[in-house]
C-alpha cells in the first residue's frame, strides 16, 4: 500500500494464538514465514483428532515413569510438543496459502499421526532416560578439580533437554540426541583420567560456541531460528 507518497510493504500470515489463529501483518518475509508456519501448525492441531489419549493408554509403566520426569511442567505439555514435532515432520517447508493446500497437508498429517506419535514418544522416553543417566553421572563426579568441566557438561545437558526441546529440536534431529547424551556420559566418566585433555577440547568447543552466538545463535535453540543457525547449532 502507499501512504504519504511512500510504499509500505507488509506480509500477511496466520498467527498462533494458543487456542485459535488470527491474521497479522509482518514487516519482513522471514517473520511472515515463521509466524505462518506456527499458525498453520495450530490449525492442523485443531483440524485433526488428537491421538494423545490413545497413545498414553498404551505406554508401558516404565515409559510413563520416565516421561513424568521430563523437563516439561506437565506430561500434557510434553505430549503437545510431541504432536507439534510430528506435524512439523510432515509439513516441512510447505507454506499452504489456499484451502486446498491446507486440506492436502491435513490429510497427510492425519494418515501418519498415530504411528508418528507412538514413535516420537518412545524416542523421547529414551532421551529423557539417558538425560537422567547423564545427570547422575555429573552429580556423581565430586572432585573439586573437575568443577569447571562438570559445569560445562551440565550446561551442555541443559542445552539439549529443556521445556520445548522436542518441537524445537525436530523429529529428524531428535534421533541424534541419544548419541549426544551417550557422548556426554562418556565424557564425564573419563574426566578424571585426563582432565587436561578435556580442558583443551572444552576450549575448542567454547571458541566455536562463541562464534555461533556472535552470529545470532543461542543455546538452547530458540523456536523459529533460521535454517543456517539451526545447522550451525548441531555442528557444535
Show where each model-derived region lies:
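Acidic, serine/threonine- and proline-rich low-complexity intrinsically disordered segments
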Residues: 1-209, 217-220, 227
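Short, intrinsically disordered, charge-balanced linker/junction segments flanking boundaries
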Residues: 209, 213, 232-235
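C-terminal tails and terminal domains of large nucleic-acid-associated
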Residues: 221-236
Amino acid at each position: 500500500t502507499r501512504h504519504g507518497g511512500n510504499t509500505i510493504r507488509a506480509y500477511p500470515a496466520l498467527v498462533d494464538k494458543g487456542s485459535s489463529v488470527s491474521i497479522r501483518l509482518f514487516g519482513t518475509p522471514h517473520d511472515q514465514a515463521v509466524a505462518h508456519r506456527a499458525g498453520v501448525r495450530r490449525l492442523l492441531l485443531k483440524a485433526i483428532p488428537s491421538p494423545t489419549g490413545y497413545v498414553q493408554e498404551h505406554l508401558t509403566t516404565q515409559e510413563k515413569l520416565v516421561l513424568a520426569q521430563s523437563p516439561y511442567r506437565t506430561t500434557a505439555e510434553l505430549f503437545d510438543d510431541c504432536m507439534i514435532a510430528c506435524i512439523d515432520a510432515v509439513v516441512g517447508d510447505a507454506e499452504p496459502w489456499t484451502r486446498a493446500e491446507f486440506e492436502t497437508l491435513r490429510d497427510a498429517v492425519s494418515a501418519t499421526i498415530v504411528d508418528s506419535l507412538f514413535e516420537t514418544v518412545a524416542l523421547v522416553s529414551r532421551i529423557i532416560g539417558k538425560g537422567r543417566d547423564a545427570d547422575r553421572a555429573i552429580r556423581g563426579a565430586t572432585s573439586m578439580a573437575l568443577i569447571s568441566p562438570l559445569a560445562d557438561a551440565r550446561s551442555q545437558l541443559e542445552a539439549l533437554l529443556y521445556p520445548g526441546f522436542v518441537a524445537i529440536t525436530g523429529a529428524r534431529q531428535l534421533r541424534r540426541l541419544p548419541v549426544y547424551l551417550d557422548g556426554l556420559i562418556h565424557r564425564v566418566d573419563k574426566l578424571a583420567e585426563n582432565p587436561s585433555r578435556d580442558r583443551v577440547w572444552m576450549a575448542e568447543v567454547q571458541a566455536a560456541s562463541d562464534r555461533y552466538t556472535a552470529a545470532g545463535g543461542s543455546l538452547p535453540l530458540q523456536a523459529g531460528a533460521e535454517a543456517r543457525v539451526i545447522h550451525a547449532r548441531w555442528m557444535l
